Every structure is written in C-alpha cells, then in structure tokens.
Amino acid sequence: MVVEADKKELICSFCSKKQHEVKKLIAGPAVFICDECIDLCTDIMKEESKVALKQITSSIPTPQKICAILNDYVVGQDQAKKILAVAVYNHYKRLEYVQSGNNDVELNKSNILLIGPTGSGKTLLAQTLAKILDVPFTMADATSLTEAGYVGEDVENILLRLLIAAEFNIAKAQKGIIYIDEVDKIARKSENPSITRDVSGEGVQQALLKIMEGTVASVPPQGGRKHPQQDFVQLDTSNILFICGGAFMGIDSIITARTNHSSIGFAANVNIDKEKNNSEILKSLEIEDLTKFGLIPEFIGRLPIVTTLDELDKDALITILTKPKNAIVKQYQKQFELDDAELVIEAAALEAIAEKALAKKTGARGLRSILEHLLLDSMYKVAELKKQRVTITKEVVNGLVEPIMTSLISTKSNKKQPIIEDIPA
C-alpha cells in the first residue's frame, strides 16, 4: 500500500523521506524507494561480495598444499596436478587483487583445458579442487548443449546449476568453478567453415565464448524455455573459473602427422613408435592441433592453460582400487561392514580387475562397474545371512568360480584376515 505523508506528497517506503527531500523516488508495485536507499542497498551488496571473496581468498592453500591434498584422492597425473594447483591458486589470488582496487596491472582470467583418455581422472581433479577451496562447483555435459533457439540445453543452464550449488547466493556463485565435460564433442564437423548451421558443435563454442571470457549473463532461475515470462538473475561470470575436459580421441594422429611421424610413403616404417603411447604423443600438443581437431581459435583463446593427463597403466589402476582415501575397494568394504560382513580381495584378483579395465579401455571409471558386477550376488546374500566373509580370487574375476563365502561365526580362531592382501613386488 502506498504510504503518503499528507495524502499529496509521496514518501519512500523504506526511510520515510518525502519526495522533495531526495533526488529521485522510484515507484514499484504499491511501494516507493528513494535514490539514497538504493545506494545503501548497493553498498550492502558490495560489502557482502567482499566478505564472500575474503572467506575464499583467506583460506587459499599454496600450490604445494593443493597438490598434497590432490594426492590423497587422485593417483598419478603429477604434472597435471602441479599445473592445476598453480592455475587455481593464481586465479583466486587474482580475485583478491582485483577486489583490492589495485589497477596497476590488469590480470586476465586463465581458464583450463584438460585433455586425457576416458577414466584418467579429469572430472575427479576438478571435483577435488572445488572441495579443497570450498567454492560452489557444478558439472555440465557439453554434448547436451545447443545454440539458443534449438532443441537442447542453453549455455545459461550451466550458470543456473552453479547458482543452485551456491543456494542462489550470487556473490558466492560468481567465485565458483564450472567443469564442462566432453568438450571435444562440440568440435566443428570439418576444419573449414560450413555453410550449414552446426548448432551442437561450432554453435555451442560460439555461445560459450562470452560466459567463459566474462560477461553479465541473464540466468533464468526456473529454466529458460518453459517459463519465458520469469525475471532473470544477473550473474557476472568474470571471476568464475571454467575447466573444460575431453578425451579428444584421434588428436594423437593429428599430432603424429604434424611431427612427421605418420606412416606415409615408401620409406615410412608402419610400426614406427609403436612403443610410444598416447600420453607421450599428447605431450607434443600444439594449439594448431586443437584447431585442426575442430575447436575454433576464439574458443581455444579462452582456455590459455592446457594440460594433458597420462593413460593409466595396470599398477596405477591397482593403486586406485586400494590406496586413495575414497578408494573403491574401501567403499565396498564399508558396505559389507554395515551388514556385519567382511570383504577380502586377493592380490591376484586386484591385478585381474585392473587387466579387465585396461582391456575395456575404460580407465578408472570401469573399475567400479567391474567390482559391482563381481559383488552383486554376494551383496544380495550377505544382507540376509550376516557374519559372512566374502573372498574374491583371480578365478572369481575371470568368471571360473563364484565368490567364496565363509561364516565368520564358524571360524575357529575368528581371526580377522587382511582385507586386501599385499601385492608381491
């Protein structure tokens, strides 16, 4: 209801100042607000933004500490960890510098591109970084994105997910991390510009350019297409860190061709560099290789930090199964423990599981599905039987026998066996 001083002169609904006492009085639905109250609200919002940033920047660990924490969760990829740790540290120090009002040198944002085979730890690295820094984090799949106006997700929906992760705290969301997976799938279909519209390839790259570089985006809080009449949330993406990841299948051939190691011509050795795996080839990656693959130069320019991840070998996969804080085997052991049961996996069985994952070319991601398949029947039974010890041998992994189940109650010594046997050197 409009508040009036003498039924003639309007007053501010917040500070009660009369119209002639302020420079401007802005009308809203049944309320008025003066320019002084607007300035006050703006100052409060700026102060909240500073507090949110201070909470983040005051607790930024050094690159060495970030690497040490990453080592607890991610196996191998030492060079990638080092590059990520330095990049993330510098990013949040840059925010502190910008917020201080010091404009001597303009520091640009450095987004990151991770290139590595499926299951090499790209997503896990990004997730772990967000946990270390305690900032809002969201993941998006590039394959579901299309240009605005076409069937599929708009790029603004990525920002909406970040807002949801930040519980719609705009100041906090503006300092978050966005991980875009499968970014290699939005490569344009051919190296040369096409006369037909590529709405899920080059079109998506074009749509991502602005938000990755930094812009004030209009984000639909209820999703963009089903509620066209809604009010939009304004989100500044200038300080959001974008990490893109992809397997980039086939880029090794582009690199090999460029470095004159392709098997072409009479003098070429067809088996040349067979011992040289994809990880070693990727270390020779250049910007022109990404362009030839299908990323447009403007998109590559928004990702100045590029790092490659190594292909995981058998030893690395075995380590992933058992060593990290959230190791897959430890998780299944805890599941069995909740049913008063034990899970024992022999060393030879661990090797067989790793070999299966290598054969499927699924990397670390395939380990869980292999274990889930092996333990399904056992988990189905132990919930009823209780006090059971389930032993997984190499023969069980290879499908020759069923998992061995023995009663813990009937065991004479009832001595607890090692949950994971030591792997012989």
Swiss-Prot record:
One example GO MF annotation: zinc ion binding
Organism: Rickettsia felis (strain ATCC VR-1525 / URRWXCal2) (Rickettsia azadi)
Record keywords: ATP-binding, Chaperone, Metal-binding, Nucleotide-binding, Zinc
Protein function: ATP-dependent specificity component of the Clp protease. It directs the protease to specific substrates. Can perform chaperone functions in the absence of ClpP.
CDD domains: RecA-like_ClpX
Protein name from the UniProt record: ATP-dependent Clp protease ATP-binding subunit ClpX
GO cellular component: HslUV protease complex
Amino-acid positions noted as binding Zn(2+) in the UniProt annotation, renumbered to this chain: C12, C15, C34, C37
